[in-house]
Amino acid sequence: MKRKVSIMIICQRLARILVILFCAAVALGAEDLTLEGQWVLVPQAGTEIDLYGALTVEIARNDGGLTLIRTFGGGRGFKDALTLKTGGVANLVPVLDRVFPTNVFMGLSMPVGSERTIKAFWDDPASPLRLDETCDVLGSQGKAPLRSQHVFRAGPSPDLMTYTITRSTRETPISYVLKRKGSREACFMALDDQWTIGEGLEKQAFLISLQGLANRDAAKLYFVYPKSWDFNYTPPVLDYYRDKKYYTFRRLSTPEQALQTFKESVRGYVVWDRNVRTSLIVAFTIAGLEQAVVVDESLIPMMAANGLVEKEDLRGKLTGWSDARIYQWAYDRYGDRCSRDFIIWLGGEHGRIMKPGVADWGMMNHAFFSDLSTKPADKEEYDLADRILDRMNPLSMVMGWHSYKKDQERDHVRLVSSHGLRVEGLHTLPNLSFSHHVAATPGFVYRNHHNIGPGKTAVPQDKVYISCIQTDGMGLGAWHEPGRGEIPYAWEVIMNYSWLAPAMMEYFYSTATPNDYFVGALGGPGYVYPKAVPKNKLPGLIAKAREMMDLLDLRVFEIMDYSEGATTEGNTELTEEVAGAFYSGMPGAIGFINGYAPSFTFAVRDKRPLISYDYYLSPSRTEEEAVADLHELAAVNARRPYFLLVHVREYSNVKRVKSIIDKLGPGFELAPLDVFVKMAGEAPTFQERFLKKR
């Protein structure tokens, strides 16, 4: 099947690429790469240094030359201090110590009393520094000549440098990565699984508020969340930041130690009332504005011991008030100072439990916090939520999650979408204030694992073709669970990570296997119900989503719209008008996905299909029952090819899905999603169906 791509689309894409490259070049140049300064070894990123395990390098320019000091190890160390003329002058350096510092576990030594001849070449501080060195070295058989070339190169970031040593006697070069002294240094702390008022939430809330202050200007404090946490990636991402982003982490063990470490970032404290749960949510708003931490009365002595001043005491002030009254009071008092680009719904669990994982990000951005009901029947809270959202800037982010006690996900996303805004969940989203400051590698390009090239065809046979998409794939999903990479599998991409947490997005792309295929989600540039969006605002949301699709090399886009109820008590179908907006707004997409549970919208335009899910794999469904379900769907949909799209809930892993697929028999074939979509566009056997509005 040939896919027609207009010259206009090609030109637009080329223009975007050129703009991205130009901006990257300007940004890189503006960051002033230079070798001068003090550098420390990133030991996990290069060749091991025998015995010493550490290396510091100091580089400075002086009249007609340079000073270079290499220090191997610490107290039991070796220092090589050189003052050299540049421009190819032969500098003679006497050998005063027999230590061969890069490889002390090899039987080599320097002949004391001899000389090293070093020629230095260095045009300017940003250019590589090259040293050509000749000397003798002693082995067990006597002297041998040795030629070495040392190259110090700044980049790819201003705080990184590579140092390579090529020797005439060694086949492979020695390579080190160093970072500027004091850069990429952070602390981490393992959080306890305590989220109940009176049983540990007080400490957790304090620490998360401290994180929001500590990370305001740089990535300084990272938390490893317990295994039960919604987002299960905090341990491997910590390893990634250490091993690939070259962070050095110091472990913190107690709240007192954490406060001592980051006290300079704290201007005071806000006291919340343990008898009024909502007061903690309000306290996060105030604390973000006042650069304060949130504490209950048990932590006040620690504040006093550290000389911190009280900014607000909510004890007794909100007793007996409804949530609507509390949030109206808070908004009247603080709303004008809060961000119009970010707002936090600190919902989720209720009662005496709260899991405020995203609070650090909200505080960092001076966001207003609430858990207002978005259910129309709760008129007072709903009306206040509606008024607050109406004051937000276009395309602003509504982060966190709805209250499980007050309303439903569909209520929350519908109201947000009706204002042309976008949701990014959840309330448990961890470490965003840290990850936001960790940049992707300069020049990193997002590459999806496409299985079929632009303009290529895929002709189906008389089979049942199955393709699987994992919900919340890179966040709550099975990314770190067994089986990933064993079968073709598609994953929803949290597209806003491209700017909210760019290194996180790089992490997922760089750890993807050839069988992992990414799809854009969900309904817009974030979580959006397009049917609920005002008609004049939908094109702008789609255009923003398309920008991220292009950046992230995504060719399939997923829509989910529960604005008119679920599959059973309402509908999740799309109107022809809404589908048309995506077809026209995303001309580079090869196809679209619709639904969560099974949905019933199907279409093809220019061989680009819109396919709804035909099956939802419940985490509680046994493998045998799932196989029976899929066989029955194939019997009902008897024409071949039959395109059976499966949505996998985040609680299932790939190994389980593979086991189900393996039991289906020879009439079924698992297809990569892009191949599946291409085949469905080439030979659709589904009937066109749209939601008809009366």
Descriptions of predicted regions:
Residues 383-393, 397-400, 459-478, 484-486, ...:
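Catalytic grooves of carbohydrate-active enzymes
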Residues 62-74, 161-165, 263-278, 394-405, ...:
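Short, hydrophobic/proline-enriched secondary-structure or compact coil segments at domain edges
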Residues 360-484:
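Non-catalytic propeptide/linker segments at domain boundaries
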Residues 194-207, 212-216, 221-234, 240-241, ...:
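Acidic-and-aromatic substrate-binding clefts and catalytic sites of carbohydrate-active enzymes
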Residues 31-182:
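Hydrophobic small-molecule pocket/channel-lining residues, especially in calycin-type beta-barrels
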Residues 184, 219, 272-360, 364-370, ...:
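Metal-dependent polysaccharide deacetylase catalytic core of the NodB/CE4 family, i.e.
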Residues 2-18:
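Bacterial N-terminal signal peptides that target proteins for export
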Residues 181-334:
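Mature N-terminal, pre-catalytic/accessory segment of carbohydrate-active enzymes
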